[in-house]
Amino acid sequence: MPDFARGPAKARRADPVVDEAAELLDSRALPGMADAAGRAMMDRAMRIVPARSETRVSEQPGFVLHAWPYRETSLILDVFTRDHGRLSMVAKGAKRPHSALRPVLQHFHPISLSWSGRGEVKTLTRAEWVGGMPPLAGDALLSAFYLNELLMRFCPREDGHPALFRHYMATLTRLAHGEAAGLVLRSFERVLLQETGFAVAFDQCLSTGERVQPHLDYVYQPERGVRRAQPSDPSSWPVVSGQTLLDMSQDDYGRAQTALQSRALMRFLLHYYLQGAPLKTRQILIDLHYL
C-alpha cells in the first residue's frame, strides 16, 4: 500500500517563466476547465439512463490529465487510463485538508484507479500512488502539459488506446531524462494522430500503394494521406522530402531537415484537425522556443 500520509514531493520548477505558464495552465488555461463546466458535467452525470448497467472497474493504471473544483470539497478529474481511455470522474472529498486523495491525484505520476458509475462522470472509489516516474521540471514540465492538452483534444471519452497510453508514459520518461523536447513531442504527435485515426502511414502513398522514395517531394493531404507534391497544391500544405517521411515512420528525428520539416508538417496537421482552434500550451512553448 502506498504511503498516503506523506505523499509525493512536488517537482520544483527552475524557470520562473515556465513556472508562471504552468501555473496558468494548471488553473484555468485548458479549454472548458472551469467551475461552471464541472457543475454542468455533474448535472449531465446525474441523468442516469435506467437501462444502462453500472460500471465497476478496479485497479486500472492511469494518469490525471486535469482537475478542477467541484463544490467545496470535491474535484472533477479528467483522467487517461490504459484500457478505458479518457474518463471524467468525481473525487469526493479530495479537497479536504487531510484527504488521503490529495497527495495521490498529481499530474504526470502513474496511479491505480478504481471507479463506479453509470453516467458520463464516474465516481472515484479508490486511488493508489504507483510511482516510478522521474520528476519533471522546467521546459519538460511545460511540454508534459502540452501532451495532456493533446490527449484532451483528440481522445474521445471511454475509448481505450493501450498503445497510446504506453507511448505517453514513455514520452514523460524521455522528457524527465532531458531529451530534446521538440523531437520527443514530434514522436508523440505522430503516434497520437495515428492511434486516434486522424492520420495514416507516413511511409506509403495511399493513392498508388507505393513506398515513399527518399529523394522525392511529398505532401500530406488531410483525410487522404501522403502523395507526391504537385505545383497545384495549396501553398499552406508543407512540402516534405520522402526521407523526412521515412525518418518519421522510424521515429528518427536526428537529421536537421527531418526535425525542421516534421515540425512544419505536424503544425499543419494539428491545426487542420483542430479546425484552427489554438492549443494554449503549444503557443507558450513556441514563444519559449521549445517547439
Curated annotation (Swiss-Prot):
Keywords: DNA damage, DNA recombination, DNA repair. InterPro entries: ARFGAP/RecO, DNA_rep/recomb_RecO_N, NA-bd_OB-fold, RecO, RecO_C. It comes from the Bacteria. Pfam families: RecO_C, RecO_N. GO terms for biological process: DNA recombination; double-strand break repair. Gene3D superfamilies: Nucleic acid-binding proteins, Recombination protein O, C-terminal domain. The keyword Acyltransferase does not apply. The keyword DNA damage applies. GO terms for cellular component: bacterial nucleoid. Involved in DNA repair and RecF pathway recombination. HAMAP family: RecO. Belongs to the RecO family. PANTHER family: DNA REPAIR PROTEIN RECO. This is DNA repair protein RecO. The lineage of its organism: Bacteria, Pseudomonadati, Pseudomonadota, Betaproteobacteria, Burkholderiales. The gene is recO.
